[in-house]
């Protein structure tokens, strides 16, 4: 595989997982709590991506390595999803 092809493949890493999150959010009124499985899948894909390509690798679909580590730690502590605030008008 050429260097250019590898770079292109790396930049597209986890794209299907990121698209699945967008589809889920759009289908559920942007309620993140209903898309937890897809978010977990993306983070796992990104974790694998960094393990295979190094912490300085780049993918448009993955958070930077340090942020991914923070997100994974938060999720392990049960701080999983953003809460959807309802706008109530009187």
Swiss-Prot record:
UniProt entry keywords in alphabetical sequence: Disulfide bond, Mitochondrion, Repeat
Q: Which Cys residues form disulphide pairs?
A: 14-45, 24-35
Per UniProt, residues of the CHCH domain are: 11-53
The UniProt annotation puts motif Cx9C motif 1 at 14-24
State the compartments where it is located. Mitochondrion intermembrane space
The principal localisation class reads mitochondrion
**Motif extent (Cx9C motif 2):** 35-45
Question: Which Gene3D superfamilies would you find in this protein's record?
Answer: CytochromE C oxidase copper chaperone
Q: Which residues form a coiled coil?
A: none
| Any Pfam family the entry gives | CMC4
Tagged with keyword GTP-binding: no
One cellular component term from this protein's GO annotations in UniProt: mitochondrial intermembrane space
| Matching PANTHER family | CX9C MOTIF-CONTAINING PROTEIN 4
Domain comment, as recorded:
The twin Cx9C motifs are involved in the recognition by the mitochondrial disulfide relay system.
Homology family: Belongs to the CMC4 family.
- This chain belongs to the protein called Cx9C motif-containing protein 4, mitochondrial
Species of provenance? Lodderomyces elongisporus (strain ATCC 11503 / CBS 2605 / JCM 1781 / NBRC 1676 / NRRL YB-4239) (Yeast)
Q: What gene is it encoded by?
A: CMC4
């Amino acid at each position: 595989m050429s260097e250019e092809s590898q770079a292109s493949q790396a930049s597209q890493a986890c794209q299907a997982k990121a698209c699945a999150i967008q589809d889920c959010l759009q289908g559920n009124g942007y309620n993140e709590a209903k898309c937890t499985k897809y978010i977990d899948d993306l983070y796992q894909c990104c974790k694998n991506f960094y393990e295979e390509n190094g912490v300085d690798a780049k993918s448009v679909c993955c958070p930077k390595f340090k942020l991914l580590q923070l997100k994974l730690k938060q999720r392990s502590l049960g701080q999983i999803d953003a809460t959807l605030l309802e706008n109530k008008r009187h």
